[in-house]
Design a protein with these regions (language model features):
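Glycine-rich phosphate-binding loop of nucleotide-binding enzymes
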Residues: 1-93
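Helical/strand "switch-coupling" subdomains that flank nucleotide/phosphate-binding cores, especially
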Residues: 81-133
């Protein structure tokens, strides 16, 4: 939750917060599978959005697309929030889905040269011979 210019990132024995006035435009979240990278990114995107900071997020796997809808308030989540002293309630965030094909979201306008050969080959599902042409 963003309160008084801070964004709560996590809490163990101490609170870990990001101070919004000194937040960097770029960052790196790295770690092994299951260490909370996606959860951290989702929390940061939600917090920045609530603070009025625009967020651009490339979600190739679709792990974070759920930001658009409020979550379900489950018992264990409410218990954890209360234990941490958080006044948590599920809420959605403003989301625009960009769609390279312009079918299921906001059309992404790009030229063939801007897309590049690798992505173009994937979009057209080319085989190795076709890619070489």
């Amino acid at each position: 939750m963003a309160t008084s210019g801070t964004l709560l990132i996590g809490q163990g024995e101490t609170v870990q917060a990001l101070h919004l006035p000194v937040a960097n435009r770029h960052g790196l979240i790295a770690g092994a599978t299951g260490t909370g990278k996606t959860t951290t990114l989702r929390l940061m995107a939600e917090g920045f959005s609530r603070a009025g900071v625009p967020v651009f997020l490339a979600d190739v796997k679709g792990d974070i697309a759920g930001l658009a809808k409020p979550g379900e308030p489950k018992g264990f989540i409410l218990e954890r929030a209360a234990k941490m002293g958080l006044d948590w309630k599920p809420e959605g965030s403003p989301v625009v889905f960009w769609d390279l094909f312009g079918v299921q979201g906001h059309p992404l306008r790009a030229t063939v040269s801007e897309i590049g050969p690798v992505l173009l080959a994937q979009m057209l599902q080319l085989n190795d011979t076709q890619e070489g042409v």
